[in-house]
């Protein structure tokens, strides 16, 4: 999960320059309209592929081996560049935090679609630990339980 199409393109360019073998595995979802085509390509590929997009946090079903890991590069904060979102956040900061928590949990849920499914979620944004500490009550217990070991390890390493 990239934060934007621009950041996804930067990541793709970096992979092409520094990890060409891994770059070949990436399916870049260039727009929300291209999402279905990219998902079909991913599901049909006989080789392991990696989807890269900011538009796969919701409305996507990738059970079992279709998604064993995911990387969230940026916390899914609502866009404060949108006037309505900025006004709503100014009126009710808790709403903004709740929307972020919902989007984060939704993204996390991409990798576990049923009781026997499993996957690993890596959240790279340094704001993640601060968000979990500050808004802990907004997150479901199972999510907090999954996040705690990673947060403790990061804290021990001084991250």
Where are these regions (language model features)?
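Conserved helicase motor "Helicase C" RecA-like lobe of SF1/SF2 P-loop NTPases
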Residues: 2-32
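Charged/polar, solvent-exposed surface patches and flexible loops
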Residues: 10-13, 17, 37-44, 106, ...
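A short acidic (Asp/Glu
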Residues: 8-14, 60-65, 132-135
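Short, structured coil segments at secondary-structure junctions
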Residues: 23, 63-66, 138, 142
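N-terminal targeting/trafficking signals and adjacent low-complexity tails
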Residues: 122-159
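Conserved RecA-like P-loop NTPase helicase motor core
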Residues: 30-131
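A generic structural motif
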Residues: 23-38, 145-159
């Amino acid at each position: 999960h990239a934060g934007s199409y621009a950041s996804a393109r930067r990541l793709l360019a970096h992979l092409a320059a520094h990890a060409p073998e891994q770059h070949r595995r990436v399916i870049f979802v260039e727009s929300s309209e291209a999402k279905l085509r990219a998902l079909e390509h991913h599901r049909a590929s006989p080789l392991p592929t990696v989807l890269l997009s900011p538009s796969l946090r919701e409305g996507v079903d990738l059970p079992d081996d279709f998604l064993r890991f995911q990387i969230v590069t940026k916390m899914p904060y609502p866009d404060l560049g949108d006037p309505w979102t900025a006004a709503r956040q100014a009126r009710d900061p808790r709403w903004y935090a709740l929307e972020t928590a919902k989007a984060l949990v939704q993204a996390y849920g991409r990798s576990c679609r049923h009781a026997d499914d499993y996957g690993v979620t890596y959240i790279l944004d340094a704001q993640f630990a601060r968000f979990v500490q500050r808004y802990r009550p907004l997150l479901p217990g199972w999510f907090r339980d999954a996040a705690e070991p990673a947060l403790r390890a990061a804290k021990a390493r001084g991250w």
